[in-house]
Amino acid sequence: MRRLSWLAALIVLFSAACKNSGTMTQHHAFRLKPGEDLKLAIDSFVKEKQIRAGWISTCVGSLTDYQIRFANQEKGYSDKGHFEIVSLVGTVSINGSHLHISISDSTGKTMGGHLLEGCKIYTTAEIVITSSDTFEFLRAKDGSTPWNELQVQPRK
């Protein structure tokens, strides 16, 4: 019983600290249906909700087709079949997103890389995005790599 009281007190204190920190977060949950394109649907949702600084909190679901790009490769790799979404992580913004996906096949073989257009939902994709009203995520070249990298700015 003491453990539960201690845990409840900790949760209340943490909630109060977050509330007083000036950081406001929102949680957005949505479901994709069979045949929808995972990346296009996420990009569309981010645009519709005008999310300027967000991240994927969780995603579970499955795909029939996938299109991913492995590290340091110019072209994507694709395949058809039935695949579980093991993980989907990354940052999202109306200014550009950066998402990585891991999928597994029917034997449990798992692979992952940059999420590209062409990942079609098999049964479902249940997605939660958390966003911050405090920051804005931008993408720009910074000289350290040839790619547009994340720039975190205070929200105006």
Functional labels for PLM-detected ranges:
Residues 1-4:
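Positively charged n-region of N-terminal signal peptides that target proteins for export
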Residues 6-8, 99:
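Hydrophobic alpha-helical context, especially transmembrane and signal-peptide helices
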Residues 8-24:
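Bacterial Sec-dependent signal peptides at the C-terminal "C-region" and cleavage site
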Residues 19-53, 57-98, 105-156:
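N-terminal intrinsically disordered, cationic/polar leader segments
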